[in-house]
């Protein structure tokens, strides 16, 4: 009789454990289905997107996007892309959106935007011993930019009267190369986001001089395809505004840059 009772108890316990295990698996499957993945296209652009010592994508844009999409019920995947093909990739659906210190200025009608969530200065940097001190001193000089970026357009189009005619505008595929060209003396100056230049100097223990006169102050946003009507862009915009108000954005930016408050002065950009 005792053996039968023991057997019955063991059997009930086994059934209970199997049931709980099944529920746990079901919960995990359910949790996965609740977390669709958003693919974010970016190139290497410290401090916005770069690989840490463990080879994991990190940076301002990575953290902001991860938190915004977490609040929306999504997981994020950072996809390293050829920056020159970003528009083609987002329009084809191979990525869901473009981030990576992406300027909204002059591109408002090209994409569906979430942002601006950061205000950034486009600036010119030179070697410390350079005789270039203001934008007009760039006349006849050689300047390097990353291809398809806002500085490239500024110097190609020269719609701003302050921008002189260069000797040569050299467009390079990767951001790191423009700093190498400047350090080696292949060019007289480079133009990029101020944060990128400052980060490069920290990472490589080098020193450039940034001109006080900026090329432009621009808003940084996340770009979706123009015909993307899923509503994800609009939801992300709401979450980014929420993060701005509750201090989350400030906390993230503070990890990477000094004087983080100035980068959140987006209300006067007019977008």
Label each residue range with its predicted role.
Residues 10-19:
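Bacterial N-terminal signal peptides
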Residues 20-30:
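Bacterial lipoprotein signal-peptidase II cleavage site
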Residues 24, 62-71, 132, 136-142, ...:
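Extended ligand-binding regions for polar small-molecule ligands
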Residues 28-101, 171, 235:
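Extracytoplasmic small-molecule ligand-binding "clamshell" domains
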Residues 42-44, 119-126, 202-238, 259-271:
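Periplasmic-binding protein-like
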Residues 65-74, 151-173, 201-205:
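Ligand-binding cleft/hinge of the Venus flytrap
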Residues 66, 75-137, 209, 214:
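Acidic, polar ligand-binding/catalytic clefts
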Residues 85-88, 101-110, 154-157, 181-217:
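A ligand-binding cleft/hinge motif common to bilobed small-molecule-binding domains
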